């Protein structure tokens, strides 16, 4: 499992997992050679333009696939992004899907969004994503994070968020939500 992380904040909470800060072939091979079945690649792509993000994710996908073929190991990507729903979504997941399918011949027929960051007070309850301020949970779309000039959004629920960010390519009514009790 190759986790691409768009910002260094989240990786501060991982334990006993390697976090690589480049995607050179030797580095990716190190990840594949580990005993762990998972490693992180810190892309810092939240600070990139869409063009820079596209270039980086295409490069990473190509290197990961090349190393996977050389080592005879299968792989899958996870795109880890901001717990307040900012970032290059859906661009990054679309690029990873396109490259993975082209490189492996396998089809990805779905995507899982799982916004949660306990340490930062980010929770999703009944399909609404919240940011904790003190003891109060505020819907993320009502916070300053949703007003971000680059990655802003107005959607109140996760299905609406998907529809908004995909510009209607995926309708809110077609999003399946699974709540934990």
Specify the residue positions occupied by each region the protein language model found:
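Short loop/turn segments at strand-loop or loop-helix junctions that form parts
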Residues: 41-46
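Alpha-helical scaffolding within the catalytic cores
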Residues: 21-28
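Cap/lid and interdomain-hinge subdomains that line or gate substrate/regulatory clefts
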Residues: 1, 5, 12-15, 28, ...
């Amino acid at each position: 499992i190759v986790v691409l992380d768009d910002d260094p904040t989240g990786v501060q909470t991982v334990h006993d997992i390697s976090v690589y800060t480049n995607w050179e072939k030797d580095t990716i091979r190190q990840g594949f050679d580990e005993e762990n079945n998972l490693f992180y690649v810190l892309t810092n792509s939240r600070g990139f333009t869409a063009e820079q993000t596209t270039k980086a994710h295409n490069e990473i996908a190509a290197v990961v696939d090349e190393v996977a073929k050389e080592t005879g190991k299968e792989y899958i990507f996870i795109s880890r992004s901001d717990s307040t729903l900012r970032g290059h979504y859906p661009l990054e997941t679309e690029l990873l899907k396109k490259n993975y399918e082209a490189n492996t011949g396998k089809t990805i027929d779905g995507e899982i969004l799982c916004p949660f960051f306990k340490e930062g007070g980010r929770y999703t309850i009944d399909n609404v994503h919240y940011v904790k301020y003190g003891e109060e949970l505020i819907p993320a779309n009502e916070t300053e994070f949703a007003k971000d000039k680059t990655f802003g959004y107005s959607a109140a629920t996760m299905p609406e968020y998907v529809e908004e960010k995909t510009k209607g390519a995926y309708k809110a009514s077609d999003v399946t939500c699974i709540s934990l009790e």
